[in-house]
Regions:
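Walker A/P-loop NTP-binding motif of AAA+ ATPase domains
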Residues: 1-114, 118, 130
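C-terminal engagement/docking regions of AAA+ P-loop ATPases
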Residues: 57, 113-125, 135-194
Length: 194
């Protein structure tokens, strides 16, 4: 991966779920995992090759599980909190996701407002539930039916935002394991004072 990035520099190397690769070595029972992390850190540091012209970004839902060595200067030394989409963002996601679906009379703004704290994945789930409802109705009388606002409102009653559980965990880390201020943005978003 690093070799390919170096061959194509300048480039951005984005690693999703970086915690799967950069979990705390002290939590690992097998040495193979520690060796993998050590190798990754050497590549990240450009020990044997230059990483000039490569911007390396990582994403995780659990930054508190990253090995502290990953957060040293020159590595993944900045944590940027990306909150769930706001109302306008949710409306835009709804419009985008429903663009090629059979719909009629959707009040996107109303649904976006009611879908507070929904992530993009939650909005996908919401739409899937609405589609399932329409499929069931279509099987009953054999006629295809477009998705409407009521279908999405019904789907909202069946799906809760997945971010709620994450915020409970994040709040605990931000309140009680935040000496360096890495999670202050989470507290600000949640309107909690330290």
């Amino acid at each position: 991966m690093f070799e390919l990035a170096r061959e194509n520099a300048p480039c951005v190397l984005f690693i999703d779920e970086i915690d799967a690769l950069g979990a705390s070595r002290s939590d690992m029972k097998q040495s193979s995992g520690r060796h993998l992390i050590n190798q990754f850190l050497q590549e990240l540091d450009g020990i044997n090759n230059s990483n000039e012209g490569i911007l390396i970004l990582g994403a995780t839902n659990t930054p508190w599980n990253l090995d502290p060595a990953f957060r040293r200067p020159g590595r993944f030394d900045r944590i940027v909190f990306v909150p769930p989409p706001d109302e306008m963002g949710r409306e835009a996601i709804l419009r985008l996701k429903l663009k090629d679906k059979p719909v009629e009379a959707i009040d996107y703004r109303s649904i976006a407002k009611k879908a507070e704290h929904f992530s993009g994945a939650d909005i996908d789930a919401l739409i899937d539930i609405a589609i399932e409802l329409k499929l069931e109705a279509s099987f009953a009388d054999g006629l295809p039916k477009p998705i409407n606002t009521n279908d999405l409102v019904t789907a909202l009653k069946k799906h809760k935002p997945s971010t709620q559980e994450w915020f409970i965990t994040a709040k605990n880390f931000a309140m009680f394991a935040n000496d360096a201020g890495l999670y202050d943005d989470i507290l600000t978003y949640m309107k909690i004072k330290k």
